[in-house]
UniProtKB/Swiss-Prot annotation:
Keywords on record: Ribonucleoprotein, Ribosomal protein
GO terms of biological process kind: translation
Pfam families from the UniProt entry: Ribosomal_L40e (PF01020)
Source taxon at top rank: Archaea
GO cellular component, one term: ribonucleoprotein complex
Family: Belongs to the eukaryotic ribosomal protein eL40 family.
Protein name: Large ribosomal subunit protein eL40
Keyword Ribonucleoprotein appears in the UniProt entry: yes
Molecular functions per Gene Ontology: structural constituent of ribosome
Gene name of the record: rpl40e
């Protein structure tokens, strides 16, 4: 998706909270906003249509 690897790492190297959708750093264990422990990696492929 990104044009070069550095940009791809900057864009996709994040975790997303599954409760409040906040962006979190890649080494987080819980959400910075709500404290929820359910974090997923940011999707590299677009979903839906």
């Amino acid at each position: 998706m990104a044009k070069f690897p550095e940009a791809e790492a900057r864009i996709f190297n994040k975790l997303i909270c599954m409760k409040c959708n906040a962006r979190n750093p890649p080494d987080a264990t819980k959400c910075r906003k709500c404290g929820y422990k359910g974090l997923r990696p940011k999707a590299r492929e677009p979903r839906g249509g």
